[in-house]
Structures are given as structure tokens and as C-alpha cells.
């Protein structure tokens, strides 16, 4: 299973480089079309007010990628990464993408992940490759 990922500070890129999975980086500069199943790994950059939480503009590349030529139709699941110190907006972008496209949020980890996180994502990818089914539950 291929990983499609977005990285702002390099944390997500470092995590992906620790896996043995094929991958492609989402960048703001190109239109990337996916024609095979993939897992999306996205960091979260969000803002929160008393009435609303939303991803900030730096995350537009993730939403643009998912919409481009209906890439979201090939996405088998979403993995969020972030910092738990941000409490209510921890992995918010992953939750927002999951809710928008009704794609399961399958896993989350902090920063650039631990060896256990790498093993868990590789196992999850292998299970999906072997036909495992997952169910969408709205994370918001």
C-alpha cells in the first residue's frame, strides 16, 4: 500500500522515511494524481475559537490533493500526526479530511512517530493490501 503524505516541518517526511512502504509526497506545487490504493498521512495545523475549529491555509494542499481528479476515491484510510499538547485540535486536519470524504481515520501518532508507530502503520498497510475492510466513523 502506497503512502501519500504532506509534510510542513519535516516530521511526517521523517516518519515515512522510516517505513518500508512506497510513498509519494504531496506538495503545493504540483497536481498529483493517484490511480492506486493509498493511505494518506497528514499533519494538523488548525485554529480553534469558541465557536469553530478549522484547518489553516497551509493545509490546503492536502484538500486540493484529495479533490484532484477524485484522488479521495483511492484513499483507503487516513493517518493523522500532531502534538497532543494541542488537545482539541490534535490531528484535526486528519479528522476534517476523514469527515469530508467519509474515509476512515485509522491511526494517529505524535511528531515523527516511534518504532511502534512505524510497525503499526506497516502492519495496517499490509492488512489493507490483503483485503481487510474498515468502516467509516465520523471523527468530528
From Swiss-Prot:
Coiled-coil segments on the chain, per record: none
Pfam family for this entry, one: Flavodoxin_NdrI
Spans traversing the lipid bilayer: none
UniProt GO BP: protein modification process
InterPro entries linked: Flavoprotein-like_sf, RNR_Ib_NrdI_bac, RNR_NrdI
SUPFAM superfamilies: Flavoproteins (SSF52218)
Record-level Gene Ontology MF annotations: FMN binding
UniProt cross-references to PANTHER family, sorted A to Z: PROTEIN NRDI
Annotated function: Probably involved in ribonucleotide reductase function.
Sequence similarity: Belongs to the NrdI family.
This protein's name: Protein NrdI
